Amino acid sequence: MEMIKTLYVTGYRSFELGIFQGKDPKITVIKNVLKKELASYIETGVEWILISGNLGVELWTAEVVGELKTEYPEVQLGLLYPFKDFGNNWNEQNRELLTKAESLADYINSVSHQPYQSPAQLKMHTKFLLEHSGGSLLIYDKEYPGKTEYFLKDAQHFSEREPYDIRLITMDDLQNSVID
């Protein structure tokens, strides 16, 4: 497998994990696992980490990349929304989380430059991410279905035609990281 330069990170939305407070201890566990995994990817050549701005794993990834920049100043964070005005209908607390992620990003854009119109924009977003990254890191467990399943299926189909690395961090992995 060739070296990955650009990595897309996604996973569960906060509500899918039953996380509704910023101080939930599960966030610390997830961020610690992300930090270890992302540091390993950076040390093996990843230069760009991409997220889409979804609540949960993606916005926590932005915070982790912000922390990792002290040790790895060369790493870049790209925030690629599926459509224009993404997150505008969120409550104030969630919009603040998105604003924080934007402040940490080195690049911000949207794949579709129109406000949300149809699921086709989400499909184009997924296609764009797959074609512009060498792999994906997903905090996702097939035994606990969530919205990330759609991306995972598309990534698996894509990897049948193109060299594309998919790394899953499961619930067991998260549980075991607490024990380590």
Swiss-Prot record:
**InterPro entries given for it?**
YspA
Recorded source organism is Enterococcus faecalis (strain ATCC 700802 / V583)
Specify one Pfam family.
Answer: YpsA
Q: Which domain of life is it from?
A: Bacteria
Q: Supply the name of the protein.
A: UPF0398 protein EF_1150
Q: Where are the transmembrane segments?
A: none
- Mind telling me which NCBIfam families this protein's record contains? PRK13660.1
Record's family? Answer: Belongs to the UPF0398 family.
